Amino acid sequence: MKQFIVSVAILAFTFPIFSWNNHAGITYLILKDHWKGKPTPKVKVESLKTFLSKEKSSIQETLSISEEWALKKLPHLTPTIESLKFSKTTKDADLVLSFYKALRVNPNHKAALYIQAVPKRNGTKLPLDQLTTLNEKGKLVNETFLSLQEGQIIGADEVLVSATDEPDYDLDLYLFEDNGSEVGKIYGFGSQPFGNPAIEFSSQAPFHMGFYYEPGIIFAFAGFLKQTYPEYRIHQFTELSKLAFRTGHPYWGYRFAGWALHYIQDLTQPYHSSVLPRVSAAKQIGVQLVSIVGYQSPKNNMINFISGRHTLIEEYQYYLIRNLIETKNWDHPVANSITEFSEQSFVKWQGIDLLRGNVCKEAYDAGDPMDEQLENLDIPKYETLYEPTHPIHTILGTLLNNTSKHTRAYLDALKSN
């Protein structure tokens, strides 16, 4: 009977999936003073194929380091099958595809040479279909992407700003065996543990969320919530970044670092580290059980109640950050929360092994008070930006201060390696 209830609960358990919108805008504000008055490093643009062709003897060794770490850390992760592993004898024409499959990411990701222009500026625009395979482009249609040429010199900040947004473009889409893709059948991730496998953007959710602090009874009924992979991605791209810097490829050093930062920034978002803030374990289980026998309204009401606040904070953050950058309103309290750091405010990057204990625990603990504060605002949905003294900016400023803090710590560690 218990197995039946657990099986049905797994099928019934659903919740809204959101992440920080506008990673590029947030990272732009963080990097405004990152080099503290020193010239921003310049790097030469390099295609992924060029990087792989020059360093192909080291690629699989680097990926194996990450996999060995991840297999010890993530009991649900299965080893990469031999046929997917990157070979130093791979033909040049197959390098990029082989690399993607060895990473176990979307093999159709484009890795175009581009920057996301933050703030907007003129240049040769890159069509969105050369950047992403997403059918629903969402807010990407609002952004400006400029095409680059191999050998062009650009700032490291431009690489990082652009790269922190890139994993959302399709890198983790359709990787599970029930997503209807060919790679989903061979990557070994099994069936999608949560979210709707039939919905495009939802298929990436287990790679961008990490639930480590739910009550034990929740994990007992919904153990699938443990099947997440952001740490795997952070480790992979951090090791690749180190390899790129070590072997004289700073463009890819920064770009891989930006990819890793995307997942770190996602985990600073409380709704990515807590399933349903302020909903007790008893209530979560209760509404799931009554839904099994046909009463869907309690579950639907609970999800709609919380998803409204998810949507509000995401939408508001997106349009506010865009506005702050476009108007250069650096004195706004949210801008100050991101950019103003005293020596006492800085933290050291503790490594991926301690990610759960600092980044994720901090976000989880912030979930309940944040959710209550948002409810008390009584704002049903985003409609307009409010005056700087509005309490929504205190909430958002606190959250983005944490995002900024951990981004800075990661980049400081990167500079010291």
Q: What do the PLM-derived regions correspond to, one by one?
A:
Residues T14-P16:
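N-terminal signal peptide c-region/cleavage motif recognized by signal peptidases
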Residues F18-L243, S273-N417:
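N-terminal, motif-rich segments that launch catalysis or mediate targeting to/interaction with membranes
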Residues K2-V8:
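Sec-dependent signal peptide recognition
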Residues V6, R246, D412:
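Residue-level marker of positions within ordered structural domains that often coincide
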Residues S241-R278:
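Active-site beta-strand/loop microenvironment that shapes enzyme catalytic pockets
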